[in-house]
Amino acid sequence: MDQQMALTWGLCYMALVALCWGHGVTEAEETVPLKTLQCYNDYTNHIICSWADTEDAQGLINMTLYHQLEKKQPVSCELSEELMWSECPSSHRCVPRRCVIPYTRFSITNEDYYSFRPDSDLGIQLMVPLAQNVQPPLPKNVSISSSEDRFLLEWSVSLGDAQVSWLSSKDIEFEVAYKRLQDSWEDAYSLHTSKFQVNFEPKLFLPNSIYAARVRTRLSPGSSLSGRPSRWSPEVHWDSQPGDKAQPQNLQCFFDGIQSLHCSWEVWTQTTGSVSFGLFYRPSPVAPEEKCSPVVKEPPGASVYTRYHCSLPVPEPSAHSQYTVSVKHLEQGKFIMSYNHIQMEPPTLNLTKNRDSYSLHWETQKMAYSFIEHTFQVQYKKKSDSWEDSKTENLDRAHSMDLSQLEPDTSYCARVRVKPISNYDGIWSKWSEEYTWKTDWVMPTLWIVLILVFLILTLLLILRFGCVSVYRTYRKWKEKIPNPSKSLLFQDGGKGLWPPGSMAAFATKNPALQGPQSRLLAEQQGESYAHLEDNNVSPLTIEDPNIIRVPPSGPDTTPAASSESTEQLPNVQVEGPTPNRPRKQLPSFDFNGPYLGPPQSHSLPDLPDQLGSPQVGGSLKPALPGSLEYMCLPPGGQAQLVPLSQVMGQGQAMDVQCGSSLETSGSPSVEPKENPPVELSMEEQEARDNPVTLPISSGGPEGSMMASDYVTPGDPVLTLPTGPLSTSLGPSLGLPSAQSPSLCLKLPRVPSGSPALGPPGFEDYVELPPSVSQAAKSPPGHPAPPVASSPTVIPGEPREEVGPASPHPEGLLVLQQVGDYCFLPGLGPGSLSPHSKPPSPSLCSETEDLVQDLSVKKFPYQPMPQAPAIQFFKSLKHQDYLSLPPWDNSQSGKVC
C-alpha cells in the first residue's frame, strides 16, 4: 500500500516536472535536406527533385531520398552545381543534389510522399529498472540572503503525497556546489547536507568576487532506492570516451519515482543540421513501439554535443516496471501536388527577318495533355549588355513576337522560357539557348540627306561643265565642217564662176526651156546663195533621159532671159539625127544638189575611143556605155584649160573671141534651129532630196529624151561630134550683158556624106580644144585668131592622144581641199600655163597648181569672185558630203 502511494506520488511529481519543462519544449526541427527538397514534374513522364545536404555531414552519413506512392522507393540522385528551387540555410554549407524520377501516373488526386533515410542503421536501446534508476526531484526556489557574518542559501523540494511516493526525506540529501563565475563547475566546491538550507561563512569566498552555487537532490546512502542525483541548476557538460560521432550518445532515462520517465541523449552538434532523432519506447517487450513527444533541445553551449530531452509517462509503474527506450533517426516528409509543380522543358527559339523587322518564334515540348496552356517570358538585349539590363516581355498563349526599335548593325541576344497556366501551375522552365543575330546596316537619315545634297550639287556641276564642254565640242566640230560661206571666195555665192546671165543664156536659146522650166531657171538665177550655209539644196536638175527631144527644123532665136545681164551662148553645130536610127537612152549626171555625182559606180572610158560618125541626116546619136563618174579631162587630148586671168576684164571681146574661135577652127556654123540649148548645172543634190527637172531638148520631137536627174553625155552640151570641140571660158567683165565667164562649146558639123560615127568611146569627157587655149593666151584687146588645128576624129582612123591643158597631164580634174574648203588644185598667183610633160593615157592622178589667182573687178551689186573654184558649196551637214564612189575594177586602165 505504501509502495502504491509512493508510486502515485511519483507519477504526479513527474507530471509536475514535465509541466515545468514545458516552457522549453519545441518540436524537432526540419533537417536541411527536408527544407531544401523541391520536386517538379512535366506531368508527362518524369519528376525532377532538388535538395541539398550539409557539407559537415558528408563524411559521417549519406542521406537517400525515398519516393512513396504505394510503397517507398529509393531515388537515385547525383551532385548538382546549384540548388535549383530553394536556398540553403545561412548557418550551413550545402551540397546540392538533383534527382530524376521516371513517373507517368500523374493525376490530380495523387499525393507523392518524399522522405530521407541514412544509408546505415542508426539507433540504441536500454532496459530501465525503476527502483534502480531513481533521480530525486530538482530543488526549487533557490535563493540567497546575506547577513553581517554569513550568507544563507535556501531551497525547497516537493515530495508529493507521502502515501504514494517512494521517496521520503530520509531517502534524499542535497549537494551544494559553488564557485566563481568564471570558473568551471568541475573546479567548484561542494558540500552535502540533509537540510533545505546551508550557511556559508565569508571566509569561504574571495572578496569582490562573484560566486555561483547550485543545488541538486541525491539519494542518501541509507536509502533502498538507487539512482542518481537530480540535475544542477546549471547543467554540467563533460567529455566522454571517443566513438562514432554520428551516432547519438549518452542516452539516459530516469524515472522520477512517481509517474514520469525522463530521458535525454546527446547528438554531435555538427550532425544536428542533417539528421533529426526521435525517442521511441515500449512499456513491455511485446507492446508496440511508440514515439516520445515532445522532444526538447537544449540551447547549444560550449560543448560539442547537443542534448535532447523527452519525458515518458509511466501510468502504472508496478504493471510496467521495465521500459524499452531507443533513439532513432526521425523520418520527416511533406506532400507535393504534381499538377501544381510542373516545370516544362525549355522552348526552341528561332528568328526570322521580315523586310525591315525581326520576329522571334519558338516551339514548346509536346505534353501528354494538349489542353494545358502556357505563358512565355521573352528577354532580349544587346550582346554587350547583361541580362539584368535586358527587356522582358510576358506573353500568354503566343508563339512569336515582333522585335521593333532595334539599332542597325548591332548584335542582339534573345532567350525564352515557359510555364503552364490556368488550372495547372508550376515554375518557369530553364531558359532556352541564347539566339544571337546581328541587324543589318542602315544608312542614317542624316547621311542620306548629306549624300543627296552632295549628289545634287555634283550633278549640277557636271551638267554645267558638261554642257559647256559639249557646246565647245559642237562648235569645234561645226568649225571643222567645210563651209565655203566663211571664205571670201564664196561671199558672192560663186557668181564669179557661174553668173546668172550665162544660165539665162542657156534658158533663152533653148526652145525646150520654155514654160515652167524657164521660170524655174530664172528663179534659181535670181536667188542669193545664202542657202549654201545650211542644208538647203538647189532645185535645179535636168529632164529624165528617157525623154528624147529633137530640135526644131526652123530657125531658133533665143532672146536673153535676164533683166540684169544677158549672154548669148555660142551655137554649137551638130548633125541632125537620122530618122531611121533609134535614139539610145543615155546615162545622165546627178544634179540633185550642189555637187556633181554619178548615178553609177564605174569609171568611164576615154573620150576619143567613144567618138562615132554622125548620121547622114545630120543628127548625132550619142551612145554612151555608161554615165559619167568623175569629171576628168581626157588623157592624150590637145584641149587645154585656159587661165582665166588672161581673159578676165575683156568685156564683149571675149564673146567675139569665142565666136571667132569657133569660126576660125574651120567648122561650119550650126543653124539656130539645129542648135540644141546648152545648159550646165553645177549643183548636185543627194538622191533623197526632191529634184526639180529641167528639160533639155535635142531639137526634134523624135530626138527628144526623157528628163531625169542627171546630165548625160548624150545632152547637146556634152555630146561631142566628129569635128573638133571648141571650148572658150572667158569672163565678161565690164559689160552688163555678161558679168561672169561663159563656157563656149562648138560642136563641128559633119558633112552629110560622111559615114556615121560608131559608138563614141570617150564621150564622157569635156575637152578643151587648142584653139580655145590659144585664144585665152592672147593678150587682152588683141585676140589672136584661133588655130584651126583642133583634132577631128575621123572614123576608122586611130585618134591621137592629146593631153589637156591641165596641171596634171593625166587628165584628172581633182579638187584640192585646204582646211574647210575645196579649190581647183594648183590655183595660185601667176599665170596658168599648160604642162609640157607628156600625158599619160590611162592615169588620172591628183593635179597640182591648176588654176592661178584671178583678179576680177568687183561690182557694187555683187562681191568680187576670188578664184575659179567650185561654183556652189554647202556645209557638210546631214547627207550633203562630197565623196568618191568606189572604183570599178573593170576599168583598171584608168584612175578616173
UniProtKB/Swiss-Prot annotation:
- Residues on Cytoplasmic side: 464-896
Q: Which InterPro entries match?
A: FN3_dom, FN3_sf, Growth/epo_recpt_lig-bind, Hempt_rcpt_S_F1_CS, Ig-like_fold, IL3_rcpt_beta, IL3RB_N, Interferon/interleukin_rcp_dom
Q: List the disulfide bonds.
A: C39-C49, C77-C99, C88-C94, C253-C263, C292-C310
**Fibronectin type-III domain ranges (all copies):** 136-243, 343-439
Give GO terms: molecular function aspect only.
Answer: cytokine receptor activity
Per the UniProt entry, what are the Gene Ontology biological process annotations, in alphabetical order? cytokine-mediated signaling pathway; regulation of cell growth
Q: Name one GO cellular component term.
A: membrane
Keyword Disulfide bond, does the record have it? yes
Q: Domain of life of the organism in this record?
A: Eukaryota
Membrane topology category:
Single-pass type I membrane protein
Q: Where in the cell is it found?
A: Membrane
* Chain positions carrying an annotated carbohydrate: N62, N141, N350
- Record region (Disordered): 220-243, 543-620, 658-725, 771-810
Q: Which Pfam families match?
A: EpoR_lig-bind, IL3Rb_N, Interfer-bind
PTM summary: May be phosphorylated by LYN.
State the span of motif (WSXWS motif). 428-432
What spans are recorded as compositionally biased (Low complexity)? 220-233, 716-725
Where does the secretion signal sit in this chain? 1-22
Which keywords annotate this record?
Disulfide bond, Glycoprotein, Membrane, Phosphoprotein, Receptor, Repeat, Signal, Transmembrane, Transmembrane helix
Q: Which residues lie on this side of the membrane: Extracellular?
A: 23-441
| Record function comment | High affinity receptor for interleukin-3, interleukin-5 and granulocyte-macrophage colony-stimulating factor.
Q: What is this protein called?
A: Cytokine receptor common subunit beta
Question: What species does this protein belong to?
Answer: Mus musculus
| Lineage summary | Eukaryota, Metazoa, Chordata, Craniata, Vertebrata
Name of the gene this protein is made from: Csf2rb
